[in-house]
Structures are given as structure tokens and as C-alpha cells.
A protein has these predicted regions:
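Beta-strand/loop edge motif enriched in small/polar residues
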Residues: 26, 52-333
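Outer/extracellular conduits and scaffolds centered on Gram-negative outer-membrane beta-barrels
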Residues: 9-14, 325
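Calcium-binding acidic motifs and repeat modules
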Residues: 5-6, 10, 137
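Intrinsic disorder/low-complexity segments
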Residues: 4, 13-15, 21, 274, ...
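Bacterial Sec-dependent N-terminal signal peptides
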Residues: 2-5, 16-57
């Protein structure tokens, strides 16, 4: 009996050793196929899985741009106050980049004369400029918008003018082919800031922008003032969308003489400005003078869809005209 007990103990010891060896052969690692470090040979997950970051770095920007600056789509940008691209400065914005306007300081991008912005988005990866608030909480006028000042002619005596509001955005010169950069496949949403009564920053404000500048495939939505406004200049624009703005869809004055083709403007029944909202508002200048060059731009293939979807829809009493053409303008539609 004593000999038999020793044999049992020996067998138990051998089985135990075999179990230990088998267990130690099971490879541990990350077994989640969606992880960055997935190990297809691992049998047991050891909790080491790594995943792509869901947090995009937010960079605050303000002040002046005087050199070449690149914004990339792996980051997001918060514009605070007036961000000015000064003479000689260049801002390049990669397709797919998201830019937020600060609501407290009413962030606004201003391209000064001699500065350049290259916001070159694509249909698949548009550049989005919008309110910093969370979706569902955003409101018209949360931030300023985009302002471009060029060196093309206008009809202001002396040739140089400051954009309304007095925020130091001067425009005008003698170069019809002036180039302020590229605005392509860009969304400008929830912009427009009142500076003084009847003086606002629009979603996209263009002061004497030259024909060397590319502006196409631009959407301005939910703006507090005009969607697009041209103060003089010669820039040609294509594929513009104005959606549910408060004031005018397209405001044209101070001798703008470029060409605009393919535009769509859609109104909301209850969104109209106290000053009166129009599809087009066109003047030669604010005084109705005969200063030259006359406001003589050509608009082609434009669709204006008004606020009254059917006769039973109640609309704001502040709506005025599809096209308010007045005071010595020579616009062609």
C-alpha cells in the first residue's frame, strides 16, 4: 500500500506539470480587431488594446497673421476676436478642416489688403466655419464670419474705403486682377455680427476683391445679416448658396462689376430683418450717386426661393422684394 501511494503522488505531480505547461502556451495580447494593436495570434485578452483618439486638438487663434500659416484637418481651430491676415500673410486651410468662431468675442477672420487666404476644400471634404456651440444650440450671429479686402477698384472717391462698422477693414485700389486667394467648397454657418445699427459683418463680406481671387462652391447658412455682400471689386463667383439668412441674400454696391453664375437662395418664413429683407439689394452706393465704376455686375442662373411655400404659410412682414434694384445701379440679371 505504501508503494501504491507513492505512485499516485508521482502521477499527480506529472499531471500538474502538464497543466502548467499547457496554460503557459496560451498567448496573451489584444484580441479586439478594431484596436490599433490587434494581435491575431493572441488567445487571451490582456487589456492592452489601444484605440484611435476620439478627441481632436482645439487650437485657439487670434491677433495677426504676418507669415505663412497652415491649418490642417487633424486639428480644429477656435477664432477669437478679429483674426487679421495682414499684408504679406498667408493662411492655408486644408480640405476637411473645421473652424469655430468664438461666441464671446464674436470671432471674425479678416483678410486685409495684401493678405491671402487659401481655403481649398473639396466636395467630399468641405471646410466648415461655424459657431463653437454644440449642434442644436447654435444661433445666427454666434460669430462674425469671413471678410476679404482686396485692391481692386470701387467707386468711392479716392478709391479707398473702410467696410461698415469701423473695425479697420480697408479695401480698394487700382488692380482689377488682384488675388486674395481661394475660397472653394466652404461652409459659413451661424455668422453675422451687428457692429452698429445697420452696420454688420456679413457671413461673407467682399470689399474690392479682385478677379484673381477664386470664390466658388460657397454656402452661407443661418446668418444674422446678409449672406453675401460685395462692396466694389471685380471677383467672379460660382455656385453660391444662401440658406435661411436674416437680411438680404445678395447685397451689391460700390461699383461691383464681376460675374456671378449658379446661385441658389432659400428663405425661411419667419426669418427677416427689421430693415427689410430681399433676395437682391443693389445700389450704386449709399447715396445713389453716379460715381463710377457703376455697380454693373452680371448674375446668371440664379434661383430665389421665397418664404411663402403656399398661400397658407404666414411669413414675416419684414420681407420686401425678390430684387430691390435702385439708385443708379446697372446690374444685369
Amino acid at each position: 500500500m505504501k508503494k501504491m501511494n507513492l505512485s499516485v503522488l508521482a502521477l499527480t505531480a506529472v499531471l500538474g506539470a502538464t497543466t502548467l505547461v499547457a496554460t503557459s502556451c496560451k498567448r496573451e495580447g489584444c484580441t479586439d480587431e478594431t484596436a490599433l494593436n490587434f494581435d491575431d495570434k493572441a488567445k487571451t485578452d490582456d487589456g492592452s488594446c489601444e484605440y484611435p483618439s476620439t478627441t481632436t486638438e482645439l487650437i485657439e487663434v487670434e491677433g495677426d497673421i504676418t507669415t505663412t500659416v497652415n491649418w490642417t484637418n487633424d486639428k480644429q481651430y477656435l477664432v477669437k476676436g478679429f483674426l487679421r491676415i495682414q499684408d504679406g500673410g498667408v493662411l492655408n486651410i486644408e480640405a476637411g478642416t473645421v473652424i469655430f468662431g468664438d461666441t464671446q468675442t464674436k470671432g471674425t477672420i479678416v483678410v486685409q489688403r495684401g493678405g491671402m487666404i487659401n481655403a481649398n476644400g473639396t466636395a467630399a471634404e468641405p471646410i466648415v466655419m461655424t459657431s463653437e456651440k454644440a449642434p442644436g444650440l447654435r444661433q445666427p450671429g454666434d460669430w462674425g464670419g469671413l471678410v476679404i479686402c482686396g485692391n481692386a477698384p470701387n467707386n468711392v472717391p479716392g478709391g479707398t474705403a473702410e467696410l461698415e462698422g469701423g473695425y479697420g477693414a480697408f479695401h480698394g485700389g487700382t488692380d482689377p486682377a488682384d488675388n486674395s486667394g481661394i475660397i472653394r467648397y466652404v461652409q459659413i454657418n451661424f455668422a453675422g455680427v451687428p457692429i452698429n445699427p445697420n452696420e454688420e459683418v456679413n457671413s461673407l463680406t467682399m470689399g474690392s476683391v479682385g478677379s484673381g481671387t477664386v470664390i466658388e462652391n460657397v454656402q452661407c447658412a443661418y446668418g444674422l445679416d446678409d449672406a453675401f455682400e460685395w462692396f466694389g471689386g471685380t471677383v467672379n463667383c460660382k455656385y453660391l448658396v444662401a440658406y435661411r439668412g436674416l437680411d438680404d441674400d445678395m447685397d451689391v454696391d460700390l461699383g461691383y462689376s464681376g460675374n456671378v453664375q449658379f446661385a441658389l437662395c432659400i428663405r425661411n418664413a419667419s426669418s427677416a430683418d427689421q430693415s427689410g429683407s430681399n433676395g437682391f439689394e443693389v445700389d450704386n452706393d449709399g447715396q445713389g450717386s453716379t460715381n463710377t465704376p457703376f455697380t454693373s455686375a452680371t448674375f446668371s442662373n440664379v434661383s430665389l426661393i421665397g418664404p411663402k411655400a403656399d398661400r397658407n404659410v404666414a411669413i414675416s412682414l419684414q420681407f420686401q422684394n425678390a430684387a430691390q434694384l435702385r439708385r443708379n445701379n446697372k446690374l444685369k440679371i
